[in-house]
Amino acid sequence: MSGTGPGAAAARDRAETPPRLVAVPGGGNGRPAARPARVVVFLGVDDDGRSRVAASLLAHRAKGRVLAVSASPVSVDPDPAVAASLAQLGVDLSRTTSVTPTAALLDKAELVVVMGYDRGDLGQGRRTEDWCIDDPSGKGADAVRCIRDAIDRRAQRLLIRMGVAIPTRPH
């Protein structure tokens, strides 16, 4: 008898609970920030590498001015080397989870960044761009850092193109 028992209840709870997206920092004075109207979706084949890294870095750099979403039909635990590499920049990868790509989500996006995903599934009329970047999952620490830095540079350039100011570091 399917649909009953503790496993079915847990599955229903997961299905009814909205997916957690990249957290939006607070607005100051203890108040939550308003949800940004601008959305960028990073669409990947699975969510253990590129798309989650890109969403995390864009959210980190945007400081709540852009909602960065990692979307993938398959969500897996992130590679520990990838999480460690992001932690070196002060980015907590555990704050970013994947959502299933839906037409409604993609319609809300100002831009859909495709990372190893079949573009044929996207339909027409969406602003998209391809980021051809190696998947960092399963690679050594040095390779992961290089990939992370390449994604970070692209994320920063994207924010500049969107007109979102990026704070500079003092030298």
Residue ranges and their predicted role:
Residues G3, A10-P32, G120-H171:
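Phosphate-binding/catalytic loops
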Residues G3, R12-P101:
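Conserved active-site segments centered on acidic
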Residues A71, S75, S85, V99, ...:
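Flexible domain-boundary/linker segments
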Residues T100-T102, D118, G140:
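Helix N-terminus capping/helix-initiation residues
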Residues L106-D107:
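A short, aliphatic-rich alpha-helical micro-motif
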Residues V112-V113, T128:
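Short, well-ordered beta-strand core segments
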